[in-house]
Amino acid sequence: MKMFDNIKNVGKLIRLERIFDKNSEKTVIIPMDHGVSSGPLDGIKDMRITTNAVADGGANAVLGHKGLVRHGHRGYGRDIGLIIHMSAGTSISPDPNKKVIVTTVEDAIRLGADAVSLHVNVGAETDFEMYRDLGLISETCEQWGMPLIAMMYPRGPKIKDEKDPEVVAHAARLGAELGADIIKTNYTGDPDTFKEVVKGCPAPIVIAGGPKTNTDEEFLQMVKDAMHAGGKGVASGRNVFQHKDVKGITRAICKIVHEDVEVKEALKEIKI
Protein backbone atom coordinates (compact mmCIF):
# COMPACT_ATOMS: atom_id res chain seq x y z
CA MET A 1 0.00 0.00 0.00
CA LYS A 2 1.43 3.33 -1.11
CA MET A 3 0.73 5.23 2.09
CA PHE A 4 3.00 2.80 3.96
CA ASP A 5 5.91 3.04 1.50
CA ASN A 6 8.00 4.69 4.23
CA ILE A 7 7.66 1.60 6.45
CA LYS A 8 10.42 -0.90 5.72
CA ASN A 9 9.60 -3.35 8.52
CA VAL A 10 8.14 -6.41 6.75
CA GLY A 11 6.30 -7.63 9.84
CA LYS A 12 4.51 -4.30 10.19
CA LEU A 13 3.51 -4.29 6.54
CA ILE A 14 2.07 -7.80 6.70
CA ARG A 15 0.03 -6.95 9.77
CA LEU A 16 -1.15 -3.62 8.34
CA GLU A 17 -2.52 -5.47 5.32
CA ARG A 18 -4.74 -7.43 7.70
CA ILE A 19 -6.42 -4.31 9.08
CA PHE A 20 -6.52 -2.14 5.93
CA ASP A 21 -8.40 -2.84 2.70
CA LYS A 22 -5.80 -3.31 -0.05
CA ASN A 23 -7.97 -1.69 -2.71
CA SER A 24 -9.24 1.40 -0.92
CA GLU A 25 -6.20 1.61 1.40
CA LYS A 26 -8.61 2.56 4.18
CA THR A 27 -9.92 0.85 7.29
CA VAL A 28 -13.06 0.47 9.37
CA ILE A 29 -12.22 -0.30 13.00
CA ILE A 30 -14.76 -0.98 15.73
CA PRO A 31 -13.34 -0.12 19.18
CA MET A 32 -14.82 -2.05 22.10
CA ASP A 33 -12.49 -0.86 24.86
CA HIS A 34 -15.25 1.09 26.61
CA GLY A 35 -15.83 -1.57 29.26
CA VAL A 36 -12.69 -0.47 31.09
CA SER A 37 -13.41 3.26 31.00
CA SER A 38 -17.20 3.20 31.36
CA GLY A 39 -18.31 -0.27 32.45
CA PRO A 40 -20.59 -2.81 30.72
CA LEU A 41 -22.35 -0.52 28.25
CA ASP A 42 -25.28 -1.66 26.14
CA GLY A 43 -23.91 -3.21 22.97
CA ILE A 44 -20.77 -4.69 24.50
CA LYS A 45 -22.17 -6.69 27.40
CA ASP A 46 -21.61 -9.75 25.21
CA MET A 47 -18.62 -8.86 23.07
CA ARG A 48 -18.80 -12.04 21.01
CA ILE A 49 -22.23 -11.10 19.63
CA THR A 50 -20.96 -7.65 18.66
CA THR A 51 -17.72 -8.98 17.17
CA ASN A 52 -19.66 -11.41 14.99
CA ALA A 53 -22.06 -8.67 13.85
CA VAL A 54 -19.39 -6.16 12.84
CA ALA A 55 -17.35 -8.88 11.14
CA ASP A 56 -20.40 -9.90 9.12
CA GLY A 57 -20.88 -6.22 8.30
CA GLY A 58 -17.41 -6.03 6.75
CA ALA A 59 -15.36 -4.23 9.41
CA ASN A 60 -11.61 -4.58 9.00
CA ALA A 61 -10.75 -4.88 12.69
CA VAL A 62 -12.01 -4.79 16.25
CA LEU A 63 -10.10 -3.03 19.01
CA GLY A 64 -10.17 -3.82 22.70
CA HIS A 65 -8.29 -4.85 25.80
CA LYS A 66 -6.83 -8.31 26.24
CA GLY A 67 -10.14 -9.58 27.65
CA LEU A 68 -11.69 -9.08 24.20
CA VAL A 69 -9.65 -12.03 22.96
CA ARG A 70 -10.89 -14.33 25.69
CA HIS A 71 -14.51 -13.20 25.78
CA GLY A 72 -15.15 -11.82 22.30
CA HIS A 73 -13.05 -13.84 19.86
CA ARG A 74 -14.90 -14.57 16.64
CA GLY A 75 -16.05 -18.18 16.49
CA TYR A 76 -17.19 -18.54 12.87
CA GLY A 77 -17.31 -16.90 9.44
CA ARG A 78 -14.93 -14.37 7.94
CA ASP A 79 -11.89 -13.38 9.94
CA ILE A 80 -11.43 -9.89 11.34
CA GLY A 81 -8.32 -7.99 12.40
CA LEU A 82 -7.43 -7.73 16.08
CA ILE A 83 -6.01 -4.60 17.73
CA ILE A 84 -5.03 -4.83 21.40
CA HIS A 85 -5.43 -1.63 23.40
CA MET A 86 -2.57 -1.07 25.83
CA SER A 87 -3.89 1.93 27.80
CA ALA A 88 -6.43 2.07 30.61
CA GLY A 89 -8.20 4.65 32.74
CA THR A 90 -11.71 4.93 34.16
CA SER A 91 -14.40 7.59 34.30
CA ILE A 92 -14.54 7.18 38.09
CA SER A 93 -10.81 7.77 38.61
CA PRO A 94 -9.66 10.98 40.35
CA ASP A 95 -8.17 11.95 36.98
CA PRO A 96 -10.12 10.31 34.12
CA ASN A 97 -7.68 11.82 31.60
CA LYS A 98 -4.74 9.83 32.97
CA LYS A 99 -4.03 6.65 31.02
CA VAL A 100 -1.60 3.97 32.17
CA ILE A 101 -0.07 1.04 30.29
CA VAL A 102 -1.66 -2.27 31.30
CA THR A 103 -0.10 -4.78 28.91
CA THR A 104 2.94 -5.33 26.69
CA VAL A 105 3.63 -5.63 22.99
CA GLU A 106 4.89 -9.16 23.65
CA ASP A 107 1.58 -10.10 25.27
CA ALA A 108 -0.29 -8.68 22.27
CA ILE A 109 1.82 -10.88 20.00
CA ARG A 110 0.96 -13.95 22.09
CA LEU A 111 -2.72 -13.06 21.75
CA GLY A 112 -2.46 -12.93 17.95
CA ALA A 113 -2.78 -9.17 17.53
CA ASP A 114 -2.41 -7.44 14.18
CA ALA A 115 -1.71 -4.07 15.85
CA VAL A 116 -1.62 -2.37 19.24
CA SER A 117 -3.03 0.99 20.29
CA LEU A 118 -2.25 3.60 22.93
CA HIS A 119 -4.40 6.44 24.24
CA VAL A 120 -2.80 9.86 24.78
CA ASN A 121 -4.74 12.84 26.15
CA VAL A 122 -2.83 15.84 24.86
CA GLY A 123 -3.10 18.66 27.37
CA ALA A 124 -3.93 16.50 30.39
CA GLU A 125 -2.05 17.20 33.60
CA THR A 126 -0.19 13.90 33.18
CA ASP A 127 0.27 14.10 29.42
CA PHE A 128 4.07 13.95 29.68
CA GLU A 129 3.81 10.42 31.11
CA MET A 130 1.68 9.33 28.16
CA TYR A 131 4.15 10.90 25.71
CA ARG A 132 6.95 8.91 27.31
CA ASP A 133 4.95 5.70 27.08
CA LEU A 134 4.16 6.29 23.41
CA GLY A 135 7.76 7.00 22.49
CA LEU A 136 9.15 3.97 24.30
CA ILE A 137 6.47 1.55 23.11
CA SER A 138 6.97 2.69 19.52
CA GLU A 139 10.53 1.36 19.79
CA THR A 140 9.29 -2.01 21.04
CA CYS A 141 6.76 -2.14 18.20
CA GLU A 142 9.54 -1.53 15.72
CA GLN A 143 11.57 -4.40 17.18
CA TRP A 144 8.66 -6.84 16.88
CA GLY A 145 7.15 -5.60 13.61
CA MET A 146 3.93 -4.56 15.35
CA PRO A 147 1.89 -1.63 13.93
CA LEU A 148 1.15 1.09 16.48
CA ILE A 149 -2.03 3.17 16.53
CA ALA A 150 -1.92 6.31 18.67
CA MET A 151 -5.25 7.70 19.84
CA MET A 152 -4.36 11.37 20.14
CA TYR A 153 -7.10 13.36 21.86
CA PRO A 154 -6.88 17.04 22.89
CA ARG A 155 -8.19 16.91 26.48
CA GLY A 156 -7.20 18.88 29.53
CA PRO A 157 -7.50 22.12 31.51
CA LYS A 158 -6.28 24.35 28.68
CA ILE A 159 -8.30 22.66 25.93
CA LYS A 160 -11.43 24.74 25.33
CA ASP A 161 -12.52 22.95 22.15
CA GLU A 162 -11.49 19.34 21.47
CA LYS A 163 -12.22 19.81 17.76
CA ASP A 164 -10.21 23.01 17.36
CA PRO A 165 -8.25 22.45 14.11
CA GLU A 166 -5.01 23.79 15.57
CA VAL A 167 -5.01 21.54 18.62
CA VAL A 168 -6.18 18.52 16.62
CA ALA A 169 -3.35 19.13 14.13
CA HIS A 170 -0.86 19.45 16.98
CA ALA A 171 -2.09 16.24 18.62
CA ALA A 172 -1.93 14.29 15.36
CA ARG A 173 1.55 15.54 14.52
CA LEU A 174 2.74 14.73 18.03
CA GLY A 175 1.66 11.11 17.67
CA ALA A 176 3.45 10.72 14.36
CA GLU A 177 6.61 12.37 15.68
CA LEU A 178 6.73 9.95 18.62
CA GLY A 179 6.61 6.91 16.35
CA ALA A 180 2.98 5.94 15.71
CA ASP A 181 2.19 4.31 12.36
CA ILE A 182 -1.47 5.36 12.41
CA ILE A 183 -3.17 8.26 14.18
CA LYS A 184 -6.71 8.19 15.52
CA THR A 185 -8.04 11.62 16.42
CA ASN A 186 -11.08 13.87 16.35
CA TYR A 187 -12.68 15.05 13.14
CA THR A 188 -12.70 18.84 13.22
CA GLY A 189 -16.26 19.06 11.91
CA ASP A 190 -15.25 20.72 8.66
CA PRO A 191 -13.59 19.13 5.58
CA ASP A 192 -11.44 22.17 4.81
CA THR A 193 -9.90 22.41 8.27
CA PHE A 194 -9.48 18.63 8.46
CA LYS A 195 -7.52 18.72 5.19
CA GLU A 196 -4.99 20.91 6.97
CA VAL A 197 -4.76 18.40 9.83
CA VAL A 198 -4.04 15.64 7.30
CA LYS A 199 -1.43 17.75 5.50
CA GLY A 200 0.42 18.37 8.75
CA CYS A 201 0.61 14.72 9.77
CA PRO A 202 3.01 12.30 8.04
CA ALA A 203 1.09 9.28 9.35
CA PRO A 204 -2.36 8.27 8.02
CA ILE A 205 -5.27 9.54 10.10
CA VAL A 206 -8.33 7.53 11.11
CA ILE A 207 -11.15 9.59 12.59
CA ALA A 208 -12.79 8.84 15.91
CA GLY A 209 -16.51 8.15 15.74
CA GLY A 210 -17.15 10.26 18.83
CA PRO A 211 -20.31 10.33 20.97
CA LYS A 212 -23.49 8.75 19.64
CA THR A 213 -25.02 11.05 17.02
CA ASN A 214 -28.70 11.99 16.69
CA THR A 215 -29.21 10.34 13.30
CA ASP A 216 -27.49 7.78 11.08
CA GLU A 217 -27.40 10.31 8.27
CA GLU A 218 -25.52 12.81 10.44
CA PHE A 219 -22.94 10.20 11.41
CA LEU A 220 -22.44 8.83 7.89
CA GLN A 221 -22.11 12.34 6.45
CA MET A 222 -19.29 13.00 8.92
CA VAL A 223 -17.56 9.83 7.72
CA LYS A 224 -18.05 10.84 4.08
CA ASP A 225 -16.68 14.35 4.63
CA ALA A 226 -13.66 13.07 6.55
CA MET A 227 -12.74 10.56 3.82
CA HIS A 228 -12.96 13.27 1.14
CA ALA A 229 -10.71 15.45 3.27
CA GLY A 230 -7.98 12.81 3.32
CA GLY A 231 -8.93 10.55 6.21
CA LYS A 232 -7.87 6.92 5.86
CA GLY A 233 -10.70 5.35 7.78
CA VAL A 234 -12.92 5.51 10.82
CA ALA A 235 -12.76 3.96 14.28
CA SER A 236 -16.26 4.11 15.72
CA GLY A 237 -17.55 2.38 18.82
CA ARG A 238 -20.82 3.66 20.29
CA ASN A 239 -22.32 4.73 16.97
CA VAL A 240 -21.92 1.11 15.89
CA PHE A 241 -22.25 -1.26 18.84
CA GLN A 242 -25.19 0.70 20.34
CA HIS A 243 -27.05 0.77 17.03
CA LYS A 244 -30.24 -1.27 16.61
CA ASP A 245 -28.74 -2.81 13.45
CA VAL A 246 -25.05 -3.31 14.21
CA LYS A 247 -24.41 -5.29 11.05
CA GLY A 248 -26.28 -2.80 8.89
CA ILE A 249 -24.56 0.35 10.18
CA THR A 250 -21.20 -1.39 9.80
CA ARG A 251 -22.02 -2.19 6.18
CA ALA A 252 -23.10 1.40 5.60
CA ILE A 253 -19.80 2.73 6.96
CA CYS A 254 -17.83 0.26 4.84
CA LYS A 255 -19.73 1.30 1.72
CA ILE A 256 -18.69 4.91 2.24
CA VAL A 257 -15.11 4.26 3.34
CA HIS A 258 -14.21 1.58 0.80
CA GLU A 259 -16.54 2.28 -2.13
CA ASP A 260 -17.17 6.03 -1.75
CA VAL A 261 -20.94 5.64 -2.17
CA GLU A 262 -23.27 8.51 -1.34
CA VAL A 263 -24.81 8.72 2.12
CA LYS A 264 -28.34 8.07 0.82
CA GLU A 265 -27.13 4.88 -0.85
CA ALA A 266 -25.27 3.73 2.25
CA LEU A 267 -28.36 4.26 4.41
CA LYS A 268 -30.10 1.48 2.46
CA GLU A 269 -27.85 -1.04 4.23
CA ILE A 270 -29.57 -0.30 7.55
CA LYS A 271 -32.65 -2.47 7.97
CA ILE A 272 -33.91 -1.32 11.39
Swiss-Prot record:
Molecular function GO labels: fructose-bisphosphate aldolase activity; hydro-lyase activity; transketolase or transaldolase activity
Protein EC: 2.2.1.10
Keywords: Amino-acid biosynthesis, Aromatic amino acid biosynthesis, Schiff base, Transferase
UniProt xrefs under SUPFAM superfamilies: Aldolase (SSF51569)
Disulfide bond positions: none
Binding site for 1-deoxy-D-threo-hexo-2,5-diulose 6-phosphate: D33, H34, G35, V36, S37, Y153, P154, R155, G209, G210, G237, R238
GO annotation terms (biological process): amino acid biosynthetic process; aromatic amino acid family biosynthetic process
Top-rank taxon, per record: Archaea
Active-site residues per Swiss-Prot or TrEMBL entry: D33 (proton acceptor), Y153 (proton donor), K184 (schiff-base intermediate with substrate)
Enzyme class, first EC level, given as a word: transferase
Chemical reaction(s) catalysed: 1-deoxy-D-threo-hexo-2,5-diulose 6-phosphate + L-aspartate 4-semialdehyde = 2,3-dioxopropyl phosphate + 2-amino-2,3,7-trideoxy-D-lyxo-hept-6-ulosonate
A Pfam family it matches: DeoC
Described function: Catalyzes a transaldol reaction between 6-deoxy-5-ketofructose 1-phosphate (DKFP) and L-aspartate semialdehyde (ASA) with an elimination of hydroxypyruvaldehyde phosphate to yield 2-amino-3,7-dideoxy-D-threo-hept-6-ulosonate (ADH). Plays a key role in an alternative pathway of the biosynthesis of 3-dehydroquinate (DHQ), which is involved in the canonical pathway for the biosynthesis of aromatic amino acids.
Family assignment from sequence similarity: Belongs to the DeoC/FbaB aldolase family. ADHS subfamily.
Quaternary structure annotation from Swiss-Prot or TrEMBL: Homodecamer.
Record's protein name: 2-amino-3,7-dideoxy-D-threo-hept-6-ulosonate synthase
Organism, scientific name: Methanococcus maripaludis (strain C6 / ATCC BAA-1332)
Organism phylogeny: Archaea, Methanobacteriati, Methanobacteriota, Methanomada group, Methanococci
